[in-house]
Amino acid sequence: MGSNGTEEITSDISTGNAATTIEIKIKMLDSQTFTLRVDKQMPVPALKAQIESLTGVMSERQRLICQGKVLKDDQLLSAYHVEDGHTLHLVARHPDLTPPGSLPNHSATEPNSSTGHGYSNQVAPGVFIETFNVPVQGDGVPSEINRIVSAVLGSMGLPNFASGGEGIFVREHDSTGLGRTSDFTGNPSRPQPEQAGFRISSDSSRNSFGFPAAVSLGSLGSLQPPVIPDSLTTLLQYLSHINHEFDTIAREGGNNVQAAEAHRNEERGFVSSRLSSTPEGLSSPASLAEVLLSTRRVIIEQAGECLLQLARQLENHADIADPLSRSSTQSRALRTGVMFYNLGAYLLELGRTTMTLRLGQTPSEAVVNGGPAVFISPSGPNHIMVQPLPFQPGASFGAIPVGAAQSNSSLGGGLGSSFFPRRIDIQIRRGASTTPGTNQEEHGDTQSASVQRNTGESSVNQTTSRRPDASIAGEPGVRVVPIRTMVAAVPVLGRFQSSVNTNNEQGSQPASQQHTAPHSTAEFTLHRQSMEDSARNGTLPTPNTQQEPSSSRVVNINILSAGGPENNESERQVPSSVLQFLRALFPGGEIHVEDPSSQGTTAGVTSAATSSGAAQAPEAEPNVSEEGIFLSNLLRGIMPVISQHIGRGGDSSEDQVTRDPSTQVEIGAGTSRRQSDSESSPPNSKRQKME
């Protein structure tokens, strides 16, 4: 019994008949195992008395655990479904913890009484710092020292300090879980009735959520570097917090507050006792099995009951007319949602840890090599890179990230661009490449046609996340999850240019700028439909269409964002991955980025249209040579492909297209509109001959 290895000691202490007699095993933390034959109807105190005679551990210090549940003294073994062959884990409480009936009144009569128990450089269980008061500036301490001390103690996880008192208040938990406090003046006291609620809420917001608010007084003298716990330890702590929160939700509105607090402290003591076991036990498959059983109990009993209660309230919400009751149900739904969000992070970490189980060839090789936790921490879930809502600093268990998205009745109050509904419309067409100064009206027609096409296709290809009749910048009401869509119209390689392109080229002249945009938009839509029909049928268009003089790929990207002017310029830009993909898909193509959300102005290489086209010509003049060189290089690359497609018809127009590339460059660059009009007459005469 004094050995550190595995030792089995058999003892028959059964007093009942053979039908109710079972054989159980008592396993201690030092791997000692005791086999007992007991009666299923035996009370738990009687079992503890028998275990005391075998192990020497007093019954007051014994904590028996069976299948993740702590055996209570007022229950029988049969209440915990203890069967033959089950193993009960024996955990001994700390010997310095005094029983509830023997609380001395002189435990803190001296200022250094807390160091008389031998807590030198280790975190002693049972002694916690509740409040550490730093003197204010009126006491002669500079504010810089206050900030330094606050920063140091804040990095340790201590809560904020009060500035109106002196001394360090120590809270010592007894076995009932209520605890007592004593300061350095030597006045132990029980919490007052008005302070009890504050202490319970303080535990709910700090200690019960895993923040390291418990630091021994001796450790303040020499701070030790924190040890990163493994995933099983973190899972146990995290599961304890979830257990407490589900208990709080289940007991909402109840009157048995003291029983709930006692149950909470009992479960906390169970977790702290489990965490004080050896590292070998924490990495064993048996420890993982206990975590799995505890998870099963929480999901079935507590999470299931929480879901059932919320579902019943939601089913009967139509019969509830009291605003206070509806507000309470709303608050309960929010808390339940946050709890299941935290439970989902726990299940992610549990799944990751379970996948690290390695049984090996022999039982001695079995190990759970989980390492530190990834998805969770003792204080709450770790925020991963992609979140439906922005990161809330300090958000952990019980913190509901609501309210920030409703500032100023819009979604622009400090939220990231990923929360705004955004639609990226990419239109790829073939036409003459012109400078931004001489092609403003063509961009306007193309943009209107793109909007009409996307409006018709929205029911099939995309789902909008805002109402069409609401404003973009400050839309009130409820928003849904934003959906980003990308619609790309890939051109046919042998597409011919219709008369609308010629009209667009002529429309840039000052004399013909007054023609209506709906007319050109309708022509462009009809031309696009006819081209798509001919491409699907595998036939060329009718001879009455004019061939494209200078074919080039022009990519227009329109960004429609619901954020309006509140978005930054970097948030409205097209992602670089999209631009790289388009450049790789269309090498040598010209990409124009337009942003209608910034009050009609365009971002990128396209500038805003003005009423006078002549005023834009001097601005576009420096870019003519660069555009001409670009178009010339582009034509050299696509001319062989165009020759193959057009040469199949045996038409002499192939010679005309390949004979005069320099003229096409001039037409595409927009340097001579009259020359383009004069040179367009030969194709018209040939078309009349063919007719």
UniProtKB/Swiss-Prot annotation:
It comes from the Eukaryota. Residues 525-535 have a biased composition (Basic and acidic residues). GO terms for biological process: ERAD pathway; nodulation. Phosphorylated at the N-terminus by CCAMK. Keywords: Nodulation, Nucleus. Residues 597-617 have a biased composition (Low complexity). Highly epressed in roots. Expressed at very low levels in leaves and stems. One of its GO terms (cellular component) is nucleus. Residues 104-118, 178-189, 273-283, 446-465, 499-523, 536-554 have a biased composition (Polar residues). It is found in: Nucleus. Involved in root nodulation. Required for root nodule organogenesis after infection by symbiotic rhizobia. Probably not involved in arbuscular mycorrhizal (AM) symbiosis. Acts downstream of CCAMK. This is Ubiquitin-like domain-containing protein CIP73. It comes from Lotus japonicus (Lotus corniculatus var. japonicus). The lineage of its organism: Eukaryota, Viridiplantae, Streptophyta, Embryophyta, Tracheophyta.
